Design a protein with these regions (language model features):
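Feature targets compositionally biased, intrinsically disordered low-complexity regions
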Residues: 29, 47, 58, 73-76, ...
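Short, compact, well-ordered microdomains
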Residues: 76-104
Length: 104
């Protein structure tokens, strides 16, 4: 299963920043929320930069994440996915809520 991550919370226009390929052991046996949680985790900057693969010891790099947006000026990585951003699975759109996800 693939999840499209769309940053909308702080942008003037929505911007697709990543496609996240959810591993089969999660997508085949898990819930939709577990797939969304996987995409959320791996598009957050916790121990490095999720959007950069050129950093040594980058705990946030995941080869299952395809970055779709250009990096920020100066090569700075993209921001973390936040409340108000959206995720798309197939034709269903979800918004990152204060706690979990809400279908929109």
């Amino acid at each position: 299963m693939q999840v499209a991550v769309i940053h909308t919370a702080f942008e003037d226009t929505p911007r697709t920043v990543a496609f996240v390929d959810v591993p089969e052991e999660i997508s085949a046996f898990g819930t939709t929320d577990e797939c969304l949680e996987y995409a959320y985790r791996w598009t957050n900057n916790i121990m490095g930069s999720w959007s950069r693969n050129d950093i040594e010891d980058n705990g946030d790099y995941n080869p299952n994440v395809t970055v779709m947006a250009p990096l920020n000026e100066g090569g700075m990585g993209l921001r973390s996915t936040s409340m108000g951003d959206q995720m798309l699975i197939g034709n269903k759109k979800y918004e990152v809520a204060m706690c979990g996800f809400e279908e929109v």
